């Protein structure tokens, strides 16, 4: 590949040759745009819209539209897109990922494709990683769009429904990945179409695309309500797990981040929980709690994976180092950690709706993204999202010097060398950003520097409120900043003149991350827009990456050389061995994400079917035919499943059939067994269907055509939602136990697909049965007022949590009132359970 690239250029270079002629056309229009009056800009926007309506394509108007945005930006915010930014804009418009280094002006680049694609009137979403950046970018760029006659909105998590509808109705909408995803889920839980906020998903530009589409890919967005399970079992499992002996009773697999009981551990579990066979399916609950307790006690590390704040367990994001308030581990792991640390164990929640970022973003008609580091994950972007990565050239050549890694035998020797390096450079006044992998390591390094008398600032999850302030000082003369991986993405480190003269920002990596991309992000904090700078990583053979994934060859070389603790080796062979260890981990993580996607695709297809049907019910005025079909299906299926064809059983089967239908849709004693015992199966179906349809027709007349249609809609939506929530739970339980199928020589993914699809079909049938049952029992005295439904929500795993929305109701029914559906039960024990 290397030789071919030298002859033909890299893929990015070849693609850029195709983009250059378009950029030449844009630049050639510069003079024409400068001659326009201010009021002409809005008129040009109207002209473009009219040309599109007449059949021109976006690509036809692109050069002129880009040139117009370029001039508008110059007049409103004093910034003019330079050539490389125009290239970036074209790449994004083409639905690709543009790799643009830190400080290259990604926020400004997004205005180009956003404007062009907004001309279709279908909306553009610009996605950032947090509320602060969404609002900042909207405020910075709004003058450009408004000068061109477009409306700009921003979605923040404290907005109400009307404000969200207005923001989504804008031509261009800024917001965070979690807000866009949660709004999609909530839109598919409403009972009235007027409550939906989003339009169809058209075009999305994702900033920090690697962070959202890869690091967060395994993170499901979850809207949940309070679960019913007790939390006591977590404490029992924790007590049992703490009594176990490592290696003897359980083993830890650091590569897979998991722990498993040995045969001896299984014996102990059987004695402790008083069960005969621990592996039995009926003991799945015990297995689940023990697995999570093992992981909590022996795999998850305090101040690395999570921290305790005010008696609450907060997850620490492994990629950014930020504490993620409002986010909880799923599958009971969070409760297991709470039991381990002796804080209050919260109840497990019940999932009401869920989707992964992978599947949410794949729903857009066109998707594009920007980041400083994407090339290392190019295969994943292409395979999962169908996106290719184009490296955009920098405006100024990169002047940063990237030194080779230095490798030490022990962690102690490595940290001593790091402190010596910091002291040396501090004397020269060179600013330094020191990247650590955990809160614990950043605090250890901080105390070592204090002993040496080196003043410094610390940025980790414990001090994240001061993040913007700390980063704003990081480029000053003599400033030493210790940061976990968070390192303030989205905020540039600007150098003072004295700092520039002292050599620019020095990046010191105290450990290699599992992902080369995270290392590149740290490096990329230095050398922005041609600034001077330097970087170096310090590695020890005791680091997690080297210990778990490193090759024995390096250990062999170090042993042969007989290195002392504070001696280092620096060689290409060592650097390439580190890189191959990282590639191994990246490949491993990619495979995990791919497998998870295969599982998620099963429920995703089911979600699409349910949400599509739900949307049709919301939009449709008349469900009469659909309800009649349901009634027929319920009656026919009941006959088929009750009558076996065995003559001796016939009378009993008919009695069971009549009893079954009386529970759903037949009044008592309307149909007697003797009336149908001489009929064929087909005649029985017709006779029963006729009886049931006549009853429903009478009900229609009693209640009134308009009212019954509204009741059908509300009941069907309620039943669909209830059954879908239960189905999500069932699929979750199926997935938890499916891994064991490998022991039976079964492919777990195929087993999950097969059984999941059977469960889905069963759910669809149960939706029909319950809908018919509720409709036949409903009795209404007067026209029902419309109910506004907002579900109880809690967040997934994002730092900006979704707050609970109050349930607003009109004409509220008391919990102990009789249910209006006519079942004779109290409201709380009947339809109230679904509300």
From Swiss-Prot:
Q: Which residues bind ATP?
A: 85, 103-107, 492
Alphabetical list of Pfam families matching this protein: P-loop_SecA, SEC-C, SecA_DEAD, SecA_PP_bind, SecA_SW
Return the InterPro entries for the record.
Answer: Helicase_ATP-bd, Helicase_C-like, P-loop_NTPase, SEC_C_motif, SecA, SecA_CS, SecA_DEAD, SecA_motor_DEAD
What catalytic reaction does the record list?
ATP + H2O + cellular proteinSide 1 = ADP + phosphate + cellular proteinSide 2
GO biological process: one example: intracellular protein transmembrane transport
The main enzyme category here is: translocase
Cellular location of this protein? Cell membrane; Cytoplasm
According to the record, cofactor stoichiometry and binding are noted as: May bind 1 zinc ion per subunit.
Q: Which domain of life does the protein's organism represent?
A: Bacteria
Q: Does the keyword ATP-binding apply?
A: yes
- Give the GO cellular component terms, alphabetically: cell envelope Sec protein transport complex; cytosol; plasma membrane
Q: What is its EC number?
A: 7.4.2.8
Broad class of the protein's primary localization = membrane
Q: How does it sit in the membrane?
A: Peripheral membrane protein
Which keywords has UniProt assigned to this entry? ATP-binding, Cell membrane, Cytoplasm, Membrane, Metal-binding, Nucleotide-binding, Protein transport, Translocase, Translocation, Transport, Zinc
The residues that the entry says bind Zn(2+) are 819, 821, 830-831
Q: Which GO terms describe its molecular function?
A: ATP binding; metal ion binding; protein-exporting ATPase activity
Is the DNA-binding keyword given for this protein?
A: no
**Cofactor(s) of this protein:** Zn(2+)
Protein function:
Part of the Sec protein translocase complex. Interacts with the SecYEG preprotein conducting channel. Has a central role in coupling the hydrolysis of ATP to the transfer of proteins into and across the cell membrane, serving as an ATP-driven molecular motor driving the stepwise translocation of polypeptide chains across the membrane.
The UniProt entry's sequence similarity note says: Belongs to the SecA family.
- HAMAP family, A to Z: SecA (MF_01382)
Subunit architecture: Monomer and homodimer. Part of the essential Sec protein translocation apparatus which comprises SecA, SecYEG and auxiliary proteins SecDF. Other proteins may also be involved.
Q: What is this protein called?
A: Protein translocase subunit SecA
């Amino acid at each position: 590949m290397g030789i071919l690239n030298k002859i033909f250029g890299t893929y990015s270079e070849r693609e850029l040759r195709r983009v250059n002629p378009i950029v030449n056309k844009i630049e050639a229009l510069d003079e024409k745009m400068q001659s326009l009056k201010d009021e002409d800009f809005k008129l040009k926007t109207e002209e473009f819209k009219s040309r599109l309506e007449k059949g021109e394509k976006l690509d036809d108007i692109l050069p002129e539209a880009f040139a117009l945005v370029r001039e508008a930006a110059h007049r409103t915010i004093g910034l003019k897109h330079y050539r490389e930014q125009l290239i970036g804009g074209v790449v994004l418009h083409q639905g690709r990922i543009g790799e643009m280094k830190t400080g290259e002006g990604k926020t400004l680049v997004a205005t180009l494709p956003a404007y062009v694609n907004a001309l279709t009137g279908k909306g553009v979403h610009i996605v950032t990683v947090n509320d602060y950046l969404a609002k900042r970018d909207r405020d910075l760029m709004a003058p450009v769009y408004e000068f061109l006659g477009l409306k700009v909105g921003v979605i923040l998590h404290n907005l109400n429904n009307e404000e969200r509808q207005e923001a989504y109705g804008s031509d261009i909408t800024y917001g965070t990945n979690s807000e866009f995803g949660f709004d999609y889920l909530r839109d598919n839980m409403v009972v009235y179409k007027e409550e939906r906020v989003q339009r169809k998903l058209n075009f999305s530009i994702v900033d920090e695309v690697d962070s959202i589409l890869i690091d967060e890919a395994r993170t499901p967005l979850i809207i949940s309500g309070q679960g019913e399970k007790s939390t006591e079992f977590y404490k029992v499992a924790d007590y049992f797990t703490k009594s176990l002996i490592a290696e003897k009773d359980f083993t830890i697999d650091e590569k897979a981040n998991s722990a498993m009981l040995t045969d001896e551990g299984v014996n102990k579990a059987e004695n402790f929980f008083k069960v005969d066979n621990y592996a039995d399916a009926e003991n799945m609950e015990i297995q689940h709690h023990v697995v999570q307790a093992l992981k909590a006690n022996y795999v998850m590390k305090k101040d690395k994976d999570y921290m305790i704040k005010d008696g609450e367990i907060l997850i620490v994001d492994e990629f950014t180092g930020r504490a993620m308030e409002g986010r909880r581990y799923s599958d009971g792991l969070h409760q297991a950690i709470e039991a381990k640390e002796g804080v209050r164990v919260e109840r497990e929640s019940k999932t009401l709706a869920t989707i992964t970022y992978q599947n949410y973003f794949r729903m857009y008609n066109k998707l594009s993204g920007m980041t400083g580091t994407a090339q290392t994950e190019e295969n994943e972007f292409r395979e999962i999202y169908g996106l290719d990565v184009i490296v955009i050239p920098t405006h100024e050549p990169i002047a940063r010097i990237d030194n080779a890694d230095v490798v030490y035998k022990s962690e102690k020797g490595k940290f001593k060398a790091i402190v010596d390096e910091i002291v040396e450079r501090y004397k020269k006044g060179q600013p330094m950003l020191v990247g650590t992998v955990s809160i614990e390591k950043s605090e250890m390094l901080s105390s070592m520097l204090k002993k040496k008398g080196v003043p410094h600032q610390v940025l980790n999850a414990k001090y994240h409120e001061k993040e913007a302030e700390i980063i704003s000082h990081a480029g000053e003369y003599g400033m030493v900043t210790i940061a976990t991986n968070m390192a303030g993405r989205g905020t540039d480190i600007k150098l003072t003149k004295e700092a520039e003269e002292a050599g620019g920002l020095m990046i010191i990596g105290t450990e290699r991350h599992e992902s080369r991309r995270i290392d590149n992000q740290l490096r990329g904090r230095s050398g922005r827009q041609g600034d001077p700078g330097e970087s170096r990583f310090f590695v020890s053979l005791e680091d997690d990456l080297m210990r778990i994934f490193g090759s024995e060859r390096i250990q062999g070389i170090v042993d042969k050389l007989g290195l002392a603790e504070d001696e280092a080796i620096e060689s290409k062979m060592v650097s390439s061995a580190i890189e191959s260890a990282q590639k191994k981990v990246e490949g491993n993580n990619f495979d995990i994400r791919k497998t998870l996607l295969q599982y998620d695709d099963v429920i995703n297809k089911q979600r699409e079917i349910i949400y599509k049907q739900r949307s049709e019910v919301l939009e449709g005025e008349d469900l009469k035919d659909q309800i009649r079909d349901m009634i027929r299906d319920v009656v026919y299926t009941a006959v088929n499943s009750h009558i076996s064809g065995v003559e001796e059983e016939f009378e009993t089967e008919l009695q069971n059939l009549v009893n079954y239908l009386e529970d759903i849709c037949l009044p008592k004693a309307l149909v007697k067994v003797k009336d149908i015992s001489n009929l064929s199966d087909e005649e029985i179906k017709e006779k029963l269907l006729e009886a049931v349809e006549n009853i429903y027709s009478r009900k229609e007349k009693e209640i009134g055509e308009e009212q019954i249609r509204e009741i059908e809609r509300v009941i069907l939506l309620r039943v669909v939602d209830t059954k879908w929530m239960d189905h999500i739970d069932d699929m979750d339980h199926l997935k938890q136990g499916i891994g064991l199928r490998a022991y039976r020589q079964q492919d777990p993914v195929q087993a999950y697909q097969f059984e999941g699809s059977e469960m889905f079909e069963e759910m669809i049938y149960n939706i029909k049965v319950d809908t018919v049952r509720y409709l036949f029992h409903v009795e209404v005295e007067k026209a029902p007022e419309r109910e506004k439904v907002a579900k109880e929500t809690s967040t997934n795993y994002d730092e900006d949590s979704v707050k609970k929305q109050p349930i607003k109701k009109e004409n509220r029914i008391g919990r102990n009132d009789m249910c209006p559906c006519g079942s004779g039960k109290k409201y709380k024990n009947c339809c109230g359970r679904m509300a």
